[in-house]
Amino acid sequence: MINDIISDSLTRIRNAGMRKLETTKLLHSKVVEALVGIFQAKGYIESFNVIEEDKKKFINVVLKYDEKGKSVINELKRISKPGRRVYKGKDEIKRFKNGYGTIVVSTSHGVLANDEAYKAGVGGEILCTIW
């Protein structure tokens, strides 16, 4: 049984990128679907789709690589964990890695990237960082 589906999903994406796999399959949840939606919008993955196998839902993620075959994801890190939650206000999430990275925030408006959360004027739980 998996206690933290977000950490599991991030680890699967990170490991698939290191092994240069074309796709990886994640367990489905609404938060993970929103998370990979942000990754796709920001250009860190090619695409994703929700599939159903034996009455269980999964998310199939197609990874993205540069022209040299290197994963476009340099670092993917879980910040807020079940044993230690991390919350930040809107002013603390404005920029990450001088604008080259993204902070994914769970807010009252849903799961948002840091620039969207800043524009909406909301803070929240820092789920992960990616660059």
Swiss-Prot record:
Q: Which residues form the signal peptide?
A: none
Record key words, sorted: Ribonucleoprotein, Ribosomal protein, RNA-binding, rRNA-binding
Q: Name one GO biological process term.
A: translation
Cellular compartments per GO CC? ribonucleoprotein complex; ribosome
Pfam families reported in the protein's UniProt record: Ribosomal_S8
- Spell out the molecular function terms from Gene Ontology: rRNA binding; structural constituent of ribosome
Q: How does it assemble?
A: Part of the 30S ribosomal subunit. Contacts proteins S5 and S12.
> What is its biological role?
One of the primary rRNA binding proteins, it binds directly to 16S rRNA central domain where it helps coordinate assembly of the platform of the 30S subunit.
This protein is called Small ribosomal subunit protein uS8
Q: Which organism is it from?
A: Campylobacter jejuni subsp. jejuni serotype O:2 (strain ATCC 700819 / NCTC 11168)
